[in-house]
A protein has these predicted regions:
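Secondary-structure boundary elements
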Residues: 49-117
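Short coil turns that delineate tetratricopeptide repeat
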Residues: 243-244, 289, 330, 370, ...
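TPR alpha-solenoid repeat register
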Residues: 248-249, 253, 294, 334, ...
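Amphipathic alpha-helical repeat scaffolds of TPR domains
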Residues: 205-224, 251-267, 295-308, 335-347, ...
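His-Asp-centered catalytic microenvironments across diverse enzyme cores
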Residues: 163-271, 275-287
Length: 481
């Protein structure tokens, strides 16, 4: 029996599959859930920081979380002071960035997205620094709008209808393109200037969404190490947290979660752990519901699981898996798998049958199932051809070529487009003509022409289109008369 080939599928995304030696079954539970935060369209500055601490994988109510929150409160106290309030909005917006670098930020590290780590050792990236700037600007009454590009995040403040960008990864990043006077000695003025940047594909996002990018960066990094135990709870919390956002944002967050689910199943499949993979997907659906992408993953996983079982002659296992999981896959995959199992069962049944019995079984399949997959139709036709040829060969081996040709003719009536059967029928008739020729040779050599002609005429009745017999008969009649 031929092996069935796997459908191979990959996830095209920035979140990709890495190597792994051991794999823990991840929990499908969120890292955290605060209903009072998740249900709001807009959060206060302190609620944004609380969410940022949680997304940084620190319990905000723990001693560590409380310490981080208090460090933030100390900064918020400064920006909400009367001294700050007495300045213009533009001055406040600029001074917030200066304050961040004087008190907290010290070293840029591209992948350091955690707010907690930023407060602990001063390392930061565009997301963590933008979250801090946004919260402080919001606390002192500024209108601050996060900005996102495919690879960067920053903030903008709106002051008197003017949109001012703030590149939070640089202490002089307020309003890029303008000069910032530096402290200097000897009455010499010095300036710093950050070139104005024309950001490609920039998009305004919500304040809640900016905070959630902490989680997105983290689970992206975890996926590179196949750390699904950490990636899934983060992605699930992010999805729940963004439920008040637009449909597009919500769908993107759910899609990220489904990508993680899919990558995990691929890892399991690479280890031939199909049943674990299917049970995991069932758990995913029970916990967070299904989507078209997750159903597609489920369908492909079950298909590959059935292929694996059938290639290992485990028809019973394949039927059990199909029975358990078929309701969670697309209908077209249900049809594919059902046909595949049916054919394997049929193939096994055919192993202990005669050719005649096999053809009866194959004919009966048309009354029991309508095949939709071309490869399955071709496989059934190949089996029919095989057993018809076996019947033909049985007669040919006994040199019953006319009977063999009749069997071939019967087969052709059932499979009219089968060129191989037509070729075999013609060969049977040709072999019959050759047999008749060989039969008359000794008669002709002994000059028993009448008997030879009689044999040829009888042969021509059975095989009226035989060129061999006609040629022999014409030559012999000329010679004999």
């Amino acid at each position: 029996m031929k092996n069935i080939f796997f459908i191979i599928f990959f996830t095209f995304t920035q979140l990709f599959l890495g190597a792994t030696n051991s794999l823990a079954i991840p929990s499908i539970q969120p890292l955290f859930h605060f209903e009072e935060i998740f249900s709001k369209d807009e959060l206060s500055s302190q609620e944004l920081i609380t969410a940022a601490i949680e997304f940084s994988e620190v319990d905000s109510s723990s001693p560590e979380g409380t310490e981080i929150f208090n460090k933030y409160l100390a900064l918020e106290k400064i920006v909400t002071s009367q001294e700050f309030a007495n300045t213009t909005e533009k001055e406040r917006a600029s001074k917030i960035l200066t304050l961040m670098y004087e008190t907290t930020l010290s070293q840029y590290i591209e992948n350091q997205t955690k707010l907690t780590t930023m407060f602990q050792n001063g390392t930061y990236n565009c997301v963590s620094s933008s979250v801090l700037y946004m919260a402080l600007a919001k606390a002192c009454g500024l209108r601050v709008v996060p900005q996102k590009t495919p690879s960067h995040a920053f903030c903008s403040v709106y002051i008197n209808n003017e949109k001012i960008d703030v590149e939070t990864t640089n202490p002089y990043g307020f309003n890029p393109g303008t000069k910032h006077e530096l402290e200097s000695q000897h009455n010499q003025k010095k300036y710093a200037i950050i070139p104005k940047i024309k950001y490609q594909n920039r998009t305004e996002i919500s304040q809640k969404n900016l905070v959630s990018l902490i989680a997105a960066n983290l689970y992206g990094a975890y996926l590179k190490k196949n750390n699904f135990t950490k990636a899934i709870p983060l992605a699930l919390s992010r999805m729940n947290y963004l439920q008040t956002e637009s449909e597009q944002i919500k769908n993107d967050a759910r899609n990220d979660l489904d990508i993680i689910f899919t990558n995990y199943t691929i890892v399991l499949e690479n280890k031939n752990q199909y049943e674990t993979s299917l049970n995991f997907l069932q758990n995913c659906i029970n916990t967070v519901g299904t989507t078209q992408k997750l159903t597609d993953t489920y369908s492909l996983t079950l298909y590959n699981a059935i292929v694996y079982e059938l290639n290992n002659k485990n028809i019973t296992n394949s039927k059990n898996l199909f029975s358990i999981h078929k309701d969670n896959i697309f209908s077209e995959y249900q049809i594919k798998i059902n046909e595949m199992i049916y054919i394997e069962e049929l193939q096994k049944e055919l192993e202990n049958t005669t050719a005649t019995q096999a053809l009866e079984l194959l004919d009966n399949t048309e009354n029991q199932i309508t095949f939709t997959q071309k490869q399955n139709i071709n496989r059934i036709n190949s089996l029919k051809e095989f057993f018809w040829i076996e019947l033909i060969n049985q007669e040919s081996e006994k040199q019953n070529y006319i009977q063999a040709a009749k069997i071939a003719e019967n087969a052709i009536s059932k499979m009219p487009n089968n060129q191989n059967l037509k070729r075999i029928k013609n060969q049977c008739l040709k072999n019959h003509g050759i047999t008749i020729h060989n039969k008359i040779v000794p008669l002709v050599n002994s000059k028993n022409y009448s008997q030879a002609i009689k044999i040829l005429e009888e042969g021509l009745k059975e095989n009226p289109n035989s060129i061999e017999i006609k040629n022999d008969l014409n030559r012999l009649k000329k010679f004999a008369y």
